């Protein structure tokens, strides 16, 4: 009688065989998570990735693989549950901080900030996490990335009509980039935004800032950004709305006026030319 040989799969070996190592079990759970993600079962994927990370932490509380699993869980939950995604990223931050992976900590804070800004619409919490990201980037010597985070805070501050804080940030970043050869001429944008922020509440302060920037950075006076703000300031001083509108149209012809700048121009227009508009 011919003997029949049964081929036992690794799954059943693990199921009925001796206990498996926790890393192997976590790997199996992670594999399941990837399968869930491949068919867009985001909640199942997120829970499985998180479980995998949790299992790895039981073996090693400073497991970088666990932190990576928490980030994967966050990416899955981001599709369906912003708050759960934040919880997963916060868990990853704890591990990365213990490991001294501060650049990655900064990236996690950036991701949390973006969720608060774009999905949950809680600007104060977004600002808090951008500040954290800026601090960690700066501590690791990534000064441009640190400044980029601060610029995001400045733009959110404009949305909150905190023009003083926004102006100070734009000014500081402008100074920082002014002293760096590769980004020296980028500073003209930050200086323009700083003056616009100040102009939203105080024409005299805006004028003083313009004079100061031209003294510190003589090349600034030759840039179109400087010429634009000079025309805007002149229009505000004389309360000439035609000059104000003409300056904006001229600048817009060769430049993109983004949402933040447009918001400030509308604020300035309303505050300065309210009678003329009516």
Swiss-Prot record:
Keywords: Protein transport, Transport. GO terms for molecular function: soluble NSF attachment protein activity; syntaxin binding. The keyword Cell division does not apply. The keyword Magnesium does not apply. Transmembrane segments: none annotated. Belongs to the SNAP family. Disulfide bonds: none annotated. This is Soluble NSF attachment protein homolog FPV011. It holds the Pfam family SNAP. One of its GO terms (biological process) is protein transport.
């Amino acid at each position: 009688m011919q003997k029949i040989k049964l081929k036992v799969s690794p799954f059943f070996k693990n199921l009925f065989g001796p206990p498996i190592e926790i890393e192997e079990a976590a790997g199996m759970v992670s594999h399941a998570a990837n399968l869930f993600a491949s068919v867009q079962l985001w909640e199942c994927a997120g829970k499985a990735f998180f479980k995998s990370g949790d299992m790895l932490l039981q073996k090693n509380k400073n497991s970088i693989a666990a932190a990576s699993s928490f980030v994967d869980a966050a990416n899955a939950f981001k599709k369906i549950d912003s708050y759960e995604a934040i919880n997963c990223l916060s868990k990853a931050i704890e591990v990365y901080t213990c490991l001294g992976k501060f650049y990655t900590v900064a990236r996690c804070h950036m991701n949390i900030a973006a969720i608060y800004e774009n999905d949950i619409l809680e600007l104060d919490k977004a600002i808090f996490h951008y500040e954290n990201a800026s601090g960690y980037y700066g501590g690791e010597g990534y000064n441009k990335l640190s400044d980029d985070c601060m610029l995001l805070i400045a733009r959110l501050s404009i949305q909150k009509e905190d023009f003083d804080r926004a102006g100070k940030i734009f000014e500081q970043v402008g100074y920082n980039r002014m002293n760096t050869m590769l980004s020296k001429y980028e500073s003209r944008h930050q200086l323009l935004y700083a003056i616009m922020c100040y102009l939203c509440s105080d024409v005299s302060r805006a004028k003083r800032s313009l004079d100061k920037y031209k003294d510190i950075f003589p090349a600034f006076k030759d840039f179109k950004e400087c010429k634009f703000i000079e025309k805007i300031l002149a229009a505000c001083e004389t309360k000439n709305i035609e000059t104000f509108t003409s300056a904006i149209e001229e600048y817009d012809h060769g430049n993109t006026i983004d949402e933040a700048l447009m918001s400030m121009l509308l604020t300035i227009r309303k505050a300065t030319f309210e009678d003329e508009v009516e």
